[in-house]
Amino acid sequence: MGSASGFICRACGTRFMARGGGGFYFDLLHCDTCGNTQNVGHQELGDIHLRYVKGLPGPYAVCRMEMDRRIQQEYPGEPIDRDEYHRLAEATLDPCACGGRFRYDALARCPGCRSLPEQWYRDPKASHVFYD
């Protein structure tokens, strides 16, 4: 489950929403240079995601337990671990418009100055939203 929260940047004063985490059926990656986000659907990833689910000790998400159990029992492909999943999934994405790459381990950035989360504080006037 992902979330979106409002922040204020200490470095430049920009108010913005930052998203983190994917959902039950998609992953959310950030650009390693500017922090823009890119969603990638598990269906789009096809065999990459199926191989990852096959290698998990349990379901990817409780809400898709039955589907994941079927994948683990019936999918004929070789399982992959999390690191390989991330590497293969990242390779399917085009570069960001800024020239950076979308990565699972890249952090969100302030859209005003590209500062990292340690430079922000929660905006008391903004909402906090969870999504799947």
Residue ranges and their predicted role:
Residues R15-M17, T37-Q38, G100-Y104, L116-Q119:
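Cys/His-rich microdomains that often coordinate metals
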Residues F24-T37, A106-L116:
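Cysteine-rich micro-motifs
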Residues M1-F24, L28-C31:
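General detector of N-terminal leader/presequence modules that precede the first folded domain
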Residues C9-C12, C31-C34, D94-C98, C110-C113:
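Short cysteine-rich clusters marking metal-coordination/redox-active sites
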Residues A18-G21, D83, A97-G100:
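A general structural-boundary detector
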Residues A91, A97-C98, D105, P111-R114, ...:
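Extended, compositionally biased low-complexity polar/Lys-Gly-rich tracts
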Residues S5, G21-G22, T37-T92, Q119-D132:
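Short, intrinsically disordered terminal segments enriched in charged and Pro/Gly residues
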Residues A4-G6, F26-L28, E90-P95, G99, ...:
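Residues immediately within or flanking Cys/His clusters that coordinate Zn2+
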